[in-house]
A protein has these predicted regions:
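Short aromatic-enriched loop/helix-cap "lid" or pocket-rim segments at secondary-structure transitions
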Residues: 40-42, 72-74, 137-142
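Flexible "cap/lid" loop of the alpha/beta hydrolase fold
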Residues: 113, 117, 123-155
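Short, hydrophobic/aromatic-rich segments at coil-to-beta transitions
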Residues: 1-6
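Gly/Ala-rich beta-loop-alpha elbow adjacent to hydrolase catalytic centers
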Residues: 104-108, 112
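Conserved HGGG/HGGXW glycine-rich cap/lid loop of the alpha/beta-hydrolase fold
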Residues: 7-71
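Short beta-strand immediately N-terminal to the catalytic nucleophile in serine-hydrolase-like folds
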Residues: 102-104, 129
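Conserved acidic catalytic loop of the alpha/beta-hydrolase fold
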Residues: 82-100
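Structural signature of beta-strand start/N-cap positions in the alpha/beta core
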Residues: 58, 99-101, 125
Length: 156
């Protein structure tokens, strides 16, 4: 069953979101690179994961601006990390969530970290999985993949 999709405004962009479950804690899940609210419920493994999260929380999921059911963005006006971070705030406001655990997956990690640092009073916990502090390896961060490793992964 696909939950009801709602929309809220963040600046001049409509952000699609869903709320699932009735647990004692709000949990905002921030997907990685792309997402699609309706498709995620069609993928059996992802649907099991989401249902498990919703079994102990009030799970709030959304499509980042430019992805899934949220408004598209112009190629020459790609969103900043700060704009996407403010989308989290807009979704939480629309869902009636004053404070939530923030769960960042992959590319959602930096976004989650920025939100937690900007809105500490609204962040009950910060959970990160598969996230990098930096996307590309550098002298001060030798643990990240190289540009060539990223490019090879996208070509595969």
């Amino acid at each position: 069953m696909v939950p009801t999709t709602h929309y809220t405004k963040s600046g001049d962009v409509h952000i699609a979101y869903q709320v699932v479950g009735e647990g004692p804690v709000d949990l905002v899940l921030i997907h990685g690179w792309t997402s699609h609210l309706e498709y995620q419920w069609e993928d059996p493994a992802l649907a099991r994961f989401l249902n498990r999260l919703a079994s102990f929380s009030r799970l709030i999921v959304f499509d980042k601006r430019g992805t899934g059911l949220s408004d598209r963005v112009a190629e020459r006006a790609l969103p900043t990390l700060e704009q996407r971070m403010d989308d989290i705030r807009a979704v939480m406001d629309a869902a009636g969530s004053n404070r939530a655990a923030i769960f960042g997956l992959s590319e959602g990690g930096p976004l989650s970290t920025l939100f937690a640092a900007t809105y500490p009073a609204r962040t009950a916990a910060l959970i990160m999985y598969g996230a990098y502090a930096k996307w590309i390896r550098s002298d001060d961060y030798p643990w990240a993949p190289t540009r060539e490793e990223h490019e090879a992964a996208f070509k595969a």
